[in-house]
Amino acid sequence: MVASVPLRNVSHLLSVLRSQNVPRYLQNGVPRDVLLFRHERGRFFAILGLFCAGQGIFWTSLAVAALSRPLSRVPAEAPNRSYQDLRSALWRYGLAVGCGTMGVLVLGAGLLYSLRSVRSVMLLAGGQQVTLTTYAPFGLGTCFTVPLNQISCMAHRGEVPAMLPLKVKGRRFYFLLDKAGHFPNTQLFDNTVGAYRSL
């Protein structure tokens, strides 16, 4: 009799879990496209794109200016003229390389951040495909569709303070979901895109 009580409780628990909507929803596939996440920050990414473009132009113009004009003219009769010319050339080329590197880093960081920040996540009808929409440079947006089994959420929504990292198989770097965004269907998100998978 004592052994039958836990068995009855377990069977009751299993029947309750089977009656929940989400597992049945996932087994049969979703009948239509379901929005799982949305976060609109198009204006921010437009400003970020303009800032990065301005920084790229600024650092490139500094590099061109460093290459085009020598810092100082060395008189022809000056002693050690060849040493001073070398120092001036090394200084100019070093400054040009440094400025060019700064411009490339700022542009690359802005481009990477805008391409990896997620605007929306849509679970397509059938429940086997997911469409991720990211902010492209200047907030123009780009989207791609991947199978659900190729997406892994690296942390639960409650574990991270600001950004939720998503790993997509075959793509470098994580995709970032801002927790300030809207999760219209949290239970379905946690059971599909928000689940951890070893890729």
From Swiss-Prot:
Keywords: Membrane, Mitochondrion, Mitochondrion inner membrane, Transmembrane, Transmembrane helix. InterPro entries: Tmem223, TMEM70/TMEM186/TMEM223. The gene is Tmem223. PANTHER family: TRANSMEMBRANE PROTEIN 223. It comes from the Eukaryota. This is Transmembrane protein 223. Associates with the mitochondrial ribosome. Residues 1-43, 116-199 are mitochondrial matrix. It comes from Mus musculus. Belongs to the TMEM223 family. One of its GO terms (biological process) is mitochondrial cytochrome c oxidase assembly.
